[in-house]
């Protein structure tokens, strides 16, 4: 592992780039001419600068995206934790197919710098394996990229030649997880956030070690707040203890599960239900994009609302809904909308969904 940035270089598809090479490449390229490759050069230029800090952007899934200043030293520690856990070694080929504006993409590059990995880059798209011809040791994707890859036989075959795949940035539904269980690749779901510089825990999705629970890295200590949200003490990657908005359960062996976000807890008639849990129950039965949100209600406090994108098969019969959900989980309103609001990273934009439901109710 190389922690001195002055001694680091990037192996990019077999070619070695030094700090001086990066300066030259940035000077002779333009964003229009070089696209994603130019973004990579600009990130490397920022990485090799004298500043010990980088600025990263949060996804904004529960509100307005914000800028965070993070320490490069802590990003390198995060990279070390992942590389050691997954057994990544110098010369291993790893795929960068996620945007560099966010921490997930940046950390793929930092892992390559710290561990001497060979970085294979593809412009972020829904089909990252479309033209990856070399076997990969490691790849990181969002659920939609994995889903799309599994629908195309040639891309699925390429994915199956990858040793390790981590999936983050969104929920993995039951149908996709069932497909993943059949893959020969070691596949993990990640838990983390921008504030923890990518993931601090992993959950194996297939093979004999498959589990429904996340296991934190050895240097991470977890507890629960008075509101049953996860509290993270990860001194290698975060200077302060982080109280999250994720409602969780922690088990005696140190593993944990996430029930949903506190922001997405709906208090309806004095009973708390989680938007994510309702979505998980309905997902196998819904043929169009949808989301659960809520609106204020004089009698219940909050009323559960189902937003459904307009489509021929959008409606789920009320009888089936009653069969699947408890009376408190059952939507009191079903609204047909043009599109489910999403963030730049493809997550449900919860704040926008709530506003959409409020606007619709006011208009009605």
PLM segments and residue spans:
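Gly/Ser/Thr-rich phosphate-binding loop
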Residues: 152-207
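Conserved pre-ATP/AMP-binding loop-to-beta segment of ANL
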Residues: 39-56, 90-93
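AMP-binding/adenylate-forming
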Residues: 71-77, 93-148
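AMP-binding/adenylate-forming core of the ANL superfamily
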Residues: 221-243, 247-249, 255, 309
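Conserved C-terminal "lid"/linker of ANL adenylate-forming enzymes
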Residues: 305-307, 320-364
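AMP-binding/adenylate-forming catalytic core of the ANL superfamily
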Residues: 247-329
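Conserved ATP-binding loop and adjacent catalytic segment of the adenylate-forming AMP-binding
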Residues: 185-226, 238-239, 364
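Conserved AMP-binding A3 loop
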Residues: 53-80, 87
